[in-house]
Amino acid sequence: MSRTNYTFTSESVSEGHPDKVCDRISDAVLDALIAEEPEARVAAETFATTNRVVIGGEVGLSDQAKLKDYMGKIDEIARACIKDIGYEQDKFHHETVEITNLLHEQSAHIAQGVDAAGDKDEGAGDQGIMFGFATDETDALMPAPIQFSHAILRRLAEVRKNGTLPVLGPDAKSQISVRYDAGKPVEVTSLVLSTQHLDEKLTSADIRALVEPYIRETLPEGWLTDNTVWHVNPTGKFVIGGPDGDAGLTGRKIIVDTYGGAAPHGGGAFSGKDPTKVDRSAAYAARYLAKNVVAAGLAHKCTLQLSYAIGVAAPLSIYVNTHDTGAVPDENIETAIRKCMDLTPRGIRTHLGLNKPIYQRTAAYGHFGRAPEADGGFSWERTDLTEALKGAV
């Protein structure tokens, strides 16, 4: 039987974290190419360190002349990301950082296994397992610890960028421990925030005084109590941040990107990957399905797994676990999912409208638990499959 009284912790990192700088650049490259050609193939990886950004991987457009033209725009794309994040420090500045572009054309051997041909449907871009998760403990149907860890950093980024707290730097991390009573989140027992700051004279107490009002307005009323333990910049000064402080790589924050450790993870990162790659698209589909199961009232909590083989279109397996909260047997939900959504790579992309430049915005503050947007962004957060699922169980 599942535990109902416990404390669970999740962390988030800001858009200025070194790994998130890399995720942002990789997704910006993807967006630029997919805006030119919706079926563009992209697998872009980024490495960032002091005064240096290296971008590599595989890309493909049907028009090689256009591809060559876009290779000349990579430097500009990367600098625009760094500028928007806010890096203007001596050893990592959007104007002076050295950008190296090592992107090259995608392997024809990969393409032949993935592309549709004749009566053969498009296959998955790789083998793998992908998980989706949803829980009704928050309005976004996300676990509370990760949802509010993101919210804290997103709010601090807002006040940094709008000039309210210009003393904050782009690099930051948050972590909250949430106590559950009868399976519901009720209070924050501890809160950790480490944020870069531009004034060397500021102490940990000074930083707490600056950020505490914004943290309090972000969390649900009553969750911060007199017993909540605060750790704000616990090591003291945090002036040198971002890739100058620690090297960054694309794809190193996969738990931050998903459910904060509250659900399994298949291991595949998202950023820089076009939607033919099921690491990304099938994980989005799994979240979409799990969220719709919960939104439909079929369960209070749902974990869903999909699996694929490279070159094979249909998923090899679909697994549902409602953690003893289901209104119907889990097997019935699995059957309903097969009826309600085409889970081939092309079916997922069509259903969720993934062949659009909607990825750069996902690179920080979580791929899940965000509001669907009018241009198709975060389409996997829609709850438009609920009636179909209820009718199919």
Swiss-Prot record:
Chain residues that bind ATP: 17, 171-173, 237-238, 246, 252-253, 269, 273
Binding site for L-methionine: 58, 106, 246, 277
Co-factor binding details: Binds 2 divalent ions per subunit. Binds 1 potassium ion per subunit.
GO terms, molecular function: ATP binding; magnesium ion binding; methionine adenosyltransferase activity
This protein's record includes keyword Transferase: yes
Hydrolase as UniProt keyword: no
Cofactor: Mg(2+); K(+)
GO biological process: one-carbon metabolic process; S-adenosylmethionine biosynthetic process
Coiled-coil spans in chain: none
Gene3D superfamilies reported in the protein's UniProt record: 3.30.300.10
CDD domains, alphabetized: S-AdoMet_synt
UniProt xrefs under HAMAP family: S_AdoMet_synth1 (MF_00086)
Protein name per UniProt: S-adenosylmethionine synthase
Taxon lineage: Bacteria, Pseudomonadati, Pseudomonadota, Alphaproteobacteria, Rhodobacterales
